[in-house]
């Protein structure tokens, strides 16, 4: 069974990035076991490899870090559960298929949200996980941005639990102008991070066998 490691407190993004990269190297070179980091970051904007500078609007005192993950700008901060799976897609029980991996991530998060009574969706040509907030109007509740090195995955998924959503106004989230963001709290679902973690671990084991 894959071990989930919860990082305490509000973690510095660059510290966690180095932690991930170091462990990816260990999986590749030393055949270390797969793990999943559960993180709650201190406030930071991060940019993926497809970012456009004009999508960074008004970041104030919040640091901006340019990363190697896929995607564009997003926000990380308190109240958001960030999940970093370090999985070896070139192992006997996996598939060397990045699109399939992302699809499995999406299914995992959708099923976890469904446990709390949230109907979540994938929208064609829009990355991430979405919920309907009004008729024909959707808001993003989870962002996805991954990278693979020698078929070992890192970076991952960020789910808004009780995140300060006003911080997303400093960017065009994921490059989608006029798109809405939401959280479990905003949808009326108040859950402790530890309770949410139990569900994502249970649902993970149903998808990634």
From Swiss-Prot:
| InterPro entries assigned | aa-tRNA-synth_II/BPL/LPL, BPL_LPL_catalytic, Octanoyltransferase, Octanoyltransferase_CS
Where does the record place the site Lowers pKa of active site Cys?
Answer: 140
Q: EC annotation?
A: 2.3.1.181
Record domain BPL/LPL catalytic: where: 30-209
Q: Where are the transmembrane segments?
A: none
Q: Note the CDD domains from the entry.
A: LipB (cd16444)
Q: What else is known?
A: In the reaction, the free carboxyl group of octanoic acid is attached via an amide linkage to the epsilon-amino group of a specific lysine residue of lipoyl domains of lipoate-dependent enzymes.
- Where is substrate annotated to bind? 69-76, 143-145, 156-158
Entry superkingdom: Bacteria
Its annotated pathway?
Protein modification; protein lipoylation via endogenous pathway; protein N(6)-(lipoyl)lysine from octanoyl-[acyl-carrier-protein]: step 1/2
In its keyword annotation, does this UniProt entry include Cell wall biogenesis/degradation?
Answer: no
Specify the protein name: Octanoyltransferase
**GO biological process: what's one of them?**
protein modification process
GO MF annotations, alphabetized: lipoyl(octanoyl) transferase activity
According to its UniProt entry, the function of this protein is described as: Catalyzes the transfer of endogenously produced octanoic acid from octanoyl-acyl-carrier-protein onto the lipoyl domains of lipoate-dependent enzymes. Lipoyl-ACP can also act as a substrate although octanoyl-ACP is likely to be the physiological substrate.
Among PANTHER family, the record links this protein to: LIPOYLTRANSFERASE 2, MITOCHONDRIAL-RELATED, OCTANOYLTRANSFERASE
Q: What enzyme category does the UniProt record give?
A: transferase
Compartment list: Cytoplasm
User: What's in the GO CC field?
Assistant: cytoplasm
Q: Which gene is transcribed and translated to give this protein?
A: lipB
Catalytic reaction(s) noted: octanoyl-[ACP] + L-lysyl-[protein] = N(6)-octanoyl-L-lysyl-[protein] + holo-[ACP] + H(+)
Instruction: State the HAMAP family in the record.
Output: LipB
Q: Which organism is it from?
A: Rickettsia rickettsii (strain Sheila Smith)
